[in-house]
């Protein structure tokens, strides 16, 4: 056995259960434990952090299962990126793995974990050195500034490793995968907050963060446009939720016949969405990474992927792969042909990426 194979086959990992099937109670316990730890990690701020240039990307933090400014600021980004890179290399034949054997699967998982660790280190360094998560500006040019940078990188690396192993815990001991769980947790928290929060918006002291309180407020003062926007957001959320539950429950029966037993056949039920939401998660995380990299490159004076004006992408690749609020534009009466073109490109990219 070569040194490389020895490293791959002896990487630290979460031990799987000894029994073949875990009880529902056992899986629920580990899933809830991982969820609680995830929320606690999101409340631990990075020590030595000054300027948090990423805090404006709230939507991206939900997709990446991250909490910018906390120890899990990297989220699932490195894990997803490593998985995408390895699948592309394996699918194109550049790197070949025999996934039909146990050893081949172990090598594939080992390389995938190494790539995830590499991207954890790489993204931690980039986030700090390119100004996304930087130490206080008053320490710039001092030895303390460099030390705080190293400390921030270490904290991000530690948080990324914890999420990596928590993903393994959920995959082996809980329900589904950690990636799906962390994203679902962030989405659920965001939906609850944006629907019911009575806290005033920091951008508009007269408005509420929650859609329901803001809908009531806008109706009482006769603000039809805001009321329409809030109502559209609530109805769209309910419609998507109902549609997702219905489609997820759909099954397609595949007829099977047996050559050795003439006249005998069965129907094998398969989920209509056989791959679940994993392809969508991977593409969404990829696009989120593009937007993050575009912002970091712009901060570094190299807007190779495009530029932002505030929180809005206004040029380059990032402008075309950013989601468009078409419904909001229609309600406001500001819909343009450019908005439709951008939305079409975004949808096409999402569909093609998910299928591939």
Q: Where are the predicted features?
A:
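Core subunits and conserved enzymes of cellular information-processing
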Residues: 1-356
């Amino acid at each position: 056995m070569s040194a490389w194979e020895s490293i791959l086959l002896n990487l630290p990992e979460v031990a799987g259960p000894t029994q073949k099937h875990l009880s529902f109670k056992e899986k629920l316990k580990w899933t809830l434990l991982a969820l609680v730890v995830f929320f606690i990690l999101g409340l631990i701020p990075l020590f030595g952090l000054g300027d948090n240039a990423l805090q404006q990307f709230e939507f991206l933090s939900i997709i990446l299962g991250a909490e910018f400014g906390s120890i899990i600021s990297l989220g699932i980004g490195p894990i997803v990126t490593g998985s995408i890179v390895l699948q592309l290399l394996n699918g194109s034949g550049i790197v070949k793995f025999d996934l039909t054997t146990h050893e081949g699967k172990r090598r594939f998982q080992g390389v995938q974990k190494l790539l995830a660790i590499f991207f954890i280190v790489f993204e931690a360094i980039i986030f700090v050195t390119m100004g996304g998560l930087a130490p206080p500006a008053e320490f710039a040019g001092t030895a303390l500034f460099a030390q705080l940078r190293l400390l921030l990188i270490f904290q991000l690396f530690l948080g990324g490793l914890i999420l990596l192993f928590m993903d393994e815990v959920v995959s082996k001991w809980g329900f589904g995968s950690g990636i799906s769980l962390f994203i679902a947790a962030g989405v659920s928290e965001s939906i609850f907050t944006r629907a019911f929060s009575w806290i005033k918006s920091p951008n508009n002291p007269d408005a509420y963060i929650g859609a329901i309180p803001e809908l009531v407020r806008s109706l009482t003062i006769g603000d039809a446009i805001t009321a329409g926007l809030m109502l559209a957001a609530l109805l769209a959320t309910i419609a998507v939720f109902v549609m997702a539950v219905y489609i997820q429950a759909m099954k397609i029966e595949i007829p099977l016949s047996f050559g050795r037993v003439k006249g005998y056949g069965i129907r094998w039920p398969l989920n209509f969405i056989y791959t679940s939401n994993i392809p969508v998660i991977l593409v969404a995380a990829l696009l989120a990474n593009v937007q993050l990299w575009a912002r970091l490159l712009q901060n570094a004076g190299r807007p190779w992927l495009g530029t932002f004006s505030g929180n809005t992408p206004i040029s380059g690749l990032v402008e075309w792969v950013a989601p468009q609020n078409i419904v909001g534009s229609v309600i406001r009466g500001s819909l343009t042909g450019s908005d439709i073109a951008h939305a079409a490109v975004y949808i096409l990219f999402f569909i093609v990426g998910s299928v591939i």
